[in-house]
Amino acid sequence: MRPGGERPVEGGACNGRSELELLKLRSAECIDEAAERLGALSRAIWSQPELAYEEHHAHRVLTHFFEREPPAASWAVQPHYQLPTAFRAEWEPPEARAPSATPRPLHLGFLCEYDALPGIGHACGHNLIAEVGAAAALGVRGALEGLPRPPPPVKVVVLGTPAEEDGGGKIDLIEAGAFTNLDVVFMAHPSQENAAYLPDMAEHDVTVKYYGKASHSASYPWEGLNALDAAVLAYNNLSVFRQQMKPTWRVHGIIKNGGVKPNIIPSYSELIYYFRAPSMKELQVLTKKAEDCFRAAALASGCTVEIKGGAHDYYNVLPNKSLWKAYMENGRKLGIEFISEDTMLNGPSGSTDFGNVSFVVPGIHPYFHIGSNALNHTEQYTEAAGSQEAQFYTLRTAKALAMTALDVIFKPELLEGIREDFKLKLQEEQFVNAVE
């Protein structure tokens, strides 16, 4: 180990640049060399949007990309990894493939998303997420392959993770053990700004059904039990409750079913609600209070109520300051202008199943500008995500991720800091590290 805490990189320094800096430049060159193939990959996914768990075309495009990526057979691809539309592609230096290879390779994961939204296609730019993950992995592999001597033991893993928008494919993969051996994970999400981190919130969704009794609305309404009244009461209960909600809590919902005809007392109604909070602990408090509002509406209307939570809760994304600082340092060298840390920590955010990943393995989920001020989940953002202009920003972000991954490989003190940040955040959240 050399004085700066870096592992030596074979090949020497040149023109005053460190060996690691030269390796980072090579990773960026590898991404540029693959730019045409990566852009075609993104366009193929964007042009045929598919909903959660139904991403068969995108899955086929991505697995074929890695199966055919030169040099031949450099990636070991498992095309239907734990889920029908998930995949796993692995690369490691030939020396590390020997049964006697020691020590255990460092496993770095790059995540791809590729599901779309109903009606408006890739309005969240998941085609670009897939491209970033693939490009960053190619950059790391290309840089390490160019070393004249074997690199440190490392395995590059690309995980295709379906169903982020609905269902939580990453949570399914966590439960199947897909993240068990990964040391650090990387992905990036398109947005309106460049942020190394945003405080994505914990989220719980719920379907509420009220059962009443039908009757003629004019002739004998007193014989009925109005399930729509129960739904309206529930909606109003939550509206009143907002006065006591913390400013960081979010509650939003719709009445999905409110009856069939005005002259029939509705015997059935249905609501769908999403609850969000900065932490799982706060989310549990919010959910309990909201469910009390639903039950009170049933009591007042004489109806019965059924409250059913979604298949998975999305956890809040744990920040990893060591990792995001390394990413910002690399990004700035590429010309990325990041929002301030204060704006980053207090800015608006949504929810993602990457939050669940961040509770089992340290990782980074930065956001990147794609050359448009359009807002996510709009038709305008769909257009922007498929534009040629977005390609420059997407590949620049992939380069920053690849460079950060190289820092993790060659700077042991950075990896130590990442792991320490991870443990401290888990302790703050009062969660046990599922990896250990």
Curated annotation (Swiss-Prot):
GO molecular function, one term: dipeptidase activity
Pfam annotation, one family: Peptidase_M20
Catalytic reaction equation(s): beta-alanyl-L-lysine + H2O = beta-alanine + L-lysine; beta-alanyl-L-ornithine + H2O = beta-alanine + L-ornithine; N(2)-(4-aminobutanoyl)-L-lysine + H2O = 4-aminobutanoate + L-lysine; N(2)-(4-aminobutanoyl)-L-ornithine + H2O = 4-aminobutanoate + L-ornithine
GO CC entries: nucleoplasm
GO term, biological process aspect, one: proteolysis
Keywords: Carboxypeptidase, Hydrolase, Protease
Keyword Hydrolase included in the entry's annotation: yes
Protease in keyword set: yes
Superkingdom: Eukaryota
CDD domains in the record: M20_ACY1L2-like
EC number: 3.4.13.4
Family: Belongs to the peptidase M20A family.
PANTHER family found in the cross-reference section: PEPTIDASE M20 (PTHR30575), XAA-ARG DIPEPTIDASE (PTHR30575:SF0)
Function: Catalyzes the peptide bond hydrolysis in dipeptides having basic amino acids lysine, ornithine or arginine at C-terminus. Postulated to function in a metabolite repair mechanism by eliminating alternate dipeptide by-products formed during carnosine synthesis.
Annotated protein name in UniProt: Xaa-Arg dipeptidase
Gene field: PM20D2
